[in-house]
Every structure is written in structure tokens, then in C-alpha cells.
């Protein structure tokens, strides 16, 4: 049996039906749900924030892998953790002090 985990991104999903899209991924065998968060600053696109993630929580018990493509990332770690992120992925170049940011993620 493989140890590979399948974590499909919802970035290309129909945002008007995100709950249904996530349930479809779960039925298809996804192990996690990958959620790309973009702020229009660190990257040019804007996607979703903690409020949407908290609403999506009711649609699945699968872990959420929340990929924060935002700056400053440290200001929002707790918000995304509280919203339902199980895994938080950051870009080291988005933080000034990685040695402080990583313990912050571990503490939430």
C-alpha cells in the first residue's frame, strides 16, 4: 500500500459550488483538500480568506492543507488555523523571520 497522500487543489473548482466540489473530491478518494490562499500582494491573484475556509469545514472532515501565498503571512496564521486549517504551507520568502514564523504555526 502506498504512503502517497492525494491533496487536490480547489483553485480550479466552481467557487459557486465549493461545498459540493469538496464532497466530490472526498468521494473520489482525496486524502486532504489543498486550498490556495492568495492576497493580490504576494501573488497577483486574490482567492479566499479564513471566513470561506470556516464555512467549507461543514462539508468535510478531510484535513485542509492551506497554502498561504500572502504577505505578511505571520499576521494571519492564527486566523487560518482557527478557520479550520490542519496544515499550513508558507513561502519562506514571504516572511522576514522564518525562525519565528514556523514556531507560530506549530503553536496554533
Residue ranges and their predicted role:
Residues 87-100:
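Conserved anion-binding
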Residues 71, 95, 103:
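Alpha-helical and His/Cys-centered functional microenvironments
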Residues 99-108:
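Single conserved hydrophobic/aromatic residue that forms the stacking wall/gate
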Residues 1-78, 82:
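Conserved N-terminal beta1-alpha1 strand-loop-helix module at the mouth
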